Amino acid sequence: MWRLRVAEGGGDPWLRTKNGHVGRQVWEFDPAAGDPDELAAVEAARRGFAARRHELKHSSDLLMRMQFAKANPLKLDIPAIKLEEHEAVTGEAVLSSLKRAIARYSTFQAHDGHWPGDYGGPMFLMPGLIITLYVSGALNTALSSEHQKEIRRYLYNHQNEDGGWGLHIEGHSTMFGSALTYVSLRLLGEGPDSGDGAMEKGRKWILDHGGATYITSWGKFWLSVLGVFDWSGNNPVPPEIWLLPYFLPIHPGRMWCHCRMVYLPMCYIYGKRFVGPVTPIILELRKELYEVPYNEVDWDKARNLCAKEDLYYPHPFVQDVLWATLHKFVEPAMLRWPGNKLREKALDTVMQHIHYEDENTRYICIGPVNKVLNMLACWIEDPNSEAFKLHIPRVHDYLWIAEDGMKMQGYNGSQLWDTAFTVQAIVATGLIEEFGPTLKLAHGYIKKTQVIDDCPGDLSQWYRHISKGAWPFSTADHGWPISDCTAEGLKAALLLSKISPDIVGEAVEVNRLYDSVNCLMSYMNDNGGFATYELTRSYAWLELINPAETFGDIVIDYPYVECTSAAIQALTAFKKLYPGHRKSEIDNCISKAASFIEGIQKSDGSWYGSWAVCFTYGTWFGVKGLVAAGRTFKNSPAIRKACDFLLSKELPSGGWGESYLSSQDQVYTNLEGKRPHAVNTGWAMLALIDAGQAERDPIPLHRAAKVLINLQSEDGEFPQQEIIGVFNKNCMISYSEYRNIFPIWALGEYRRRVLAADK
């Protein structure tokens, strides 16, 4: 039976940590664990998901819930409430709902203070890991037979009815998702006709849509590594770009760090033209993936082919000219003397940057894509290297299992992010003493996860921003600082500092708060906006050379309403408690940031949310940031327009329910059937409450509160509904804790600020 292990290293000599592995979450298989009833419950959950997999594509994290239910048994003695259409929402009903929800949600808190959960969703992550482990000969070393079995389960479970696989679990079939998933299943031991016809259906989808030559550029890269696509069918990824002077706008050090850190090892692997061993499976795949014999494929033509199902960001003409020039003239010169000397120097430079990233994230790396690419680059450099051995155990930091199988997550978790939001949600309910132990544990996690040092060496040499005082998205061992994570961590720390330490523990030291404020203010761009990990270092026109057909806005670190709003909120909260610290700088920062938020509001009153679905999320941040900066409904046209927008989207039944298509198409789209979503409803309620909606017309808030109460399950939780996170406009990702955090937060604010106002 599978067991979740939290904050453990297992005595592995190849694991490094800064803080005793706080936040680490790893699933292990114990063949002796589980009694017959537990094993039967797990199998029932798996069958249940498989039976409904085309209707409900998101797991409910039932394996984790079963484990916590056994470890932290809870008998709810508060009756569940369902309100009839004619019934009004009462304070008693809301209080009952909140107590039941927080009591249940608290049982899922790990002993180190964070809330573990599924952060999966993208389907293109696991194939990179499988291919890397296969070509390096480490597949069976890194992944047990049970791991491989659960990965196969996951890949089969998320096959679409047409036979293909999507970019993410709720997406339509794409060549990127289909070809890579099919290949992964073959490498994991599935035959061409396995899976009760599933493999045959998958292969048919691939061939019916032109074959693997139509896969996206990232897919071409992975298939070339494996040996089932020729490197000449790839547009160049020249490592020499790392030798350019930094003042050039196209220098990779000026790019968004996720883009930079993915193309960094890609440069190395492309520069080496590495191809894995040609095994019998590879020869079979060369026959299975193409409409014509492998030796007859037109690789030059294949360079720019992309299936229409995958094409979110079509290449502009300038890109076609650039790739053709590099392919036909520059690359041939780099493969012979004297160009090959320059290539060797470039590859050496790239490898230095790869090692710096690995060492400063304890071999977790910034994300799952560069994690496996860096691991492969280390193996290519030296198959017996210490670096490769240090990479292997960190593979498990990215793997998560639920009733749908084992997936690769979009990060090593969302630990700090979810914990900071949870603290704010529980404090908003006013039930602080009742849930003091929960807050105290969470406080401990927040304190232990703050980044206390900058990365070593000359930061400019490694193109790194300062880190000291920041909070990361997940764990201190990961350590990459992020503006909004720093802001949310700081907000949570400040809230907890106002509560008796007898209840929540000792507050974060003042000097560490000062460090956090210093780091946070360092993120402000000249236009007042805040980007994610770093300042915006180059120009938006660089998006013209975005080679990833599947994603939008990846080349530079753009400023976002979410990051900017979070910074305003944190600085405002800090200023109230420490009014004398850098007062004029903080005031100027808040003023410029608020103007930036007003400047990017859409004409309909909304803000586009870039990190969750979508306009309800962005508009919550827009409103909350402006209110924190001192704007009100009366003095701010932007807030008035935002309220009009949100009220216009409330469903006839009450509540809000926004589809991921809003993110993809950038047009507000309701869920199919105009169903409410608990998380969207929570965001909209929080925005309207902050904007003073209760003083004008509380009825929309009463209706929304009733929706949330009636969505609540018998066990106190809110349901897992459609996927709610997003990145780069087109790929969805799971934020599994949101289902409980935001209904709790919204009902808490509603109870304190709407119902109390009515009295």
Swiss-Prot record:
The keyword Repeat applies. Pfam families: SQHop_cyclase_C, SQHop_cyclase_N. Its EC number is 5.4.99.8. One of its GO terms (molecular function) is cycloartenol synthase activity. This is Cycloartenol synthase. Belongs to the terpene cyclase/mutase family. GO terms for cellular component: lipid droplet. Converts oxidosqualene ((3S)-2,3-epoxy-2,3-dihydrosqualene) to cycloartenol. InterPro entries: SQ_cyclase_C (IPR032696), SQ_cyclase_N (IPR032697), Squalene_cyclase (IPR018333), Terpene_synthase_CS (IPR002365), Terpenoid_cyclase/PrenylTrfase (IPR008930). NCBIfam families: squalene_cyclas. Gene3D superfamilies: 1.50.10.20. Keywords: Isomerase, Repeat. GO terms for biological process: triterpenoid biosynthetic process. The active site is at residue 484. PFTB repeats lie at residues 148-189, 513-558, 590-630, 639-680. The lineage of its organism: Eukaryota, Viridiplantae, Streptophyta, Embryophyta, Tracheophyta. The keyword Isomerase applies. CDD domains: SQCY_1. PANTHER family: LANOSTEROL SYNTHASE, TERPENE CYCLASE/MUTASE FAMILY MEMBER.
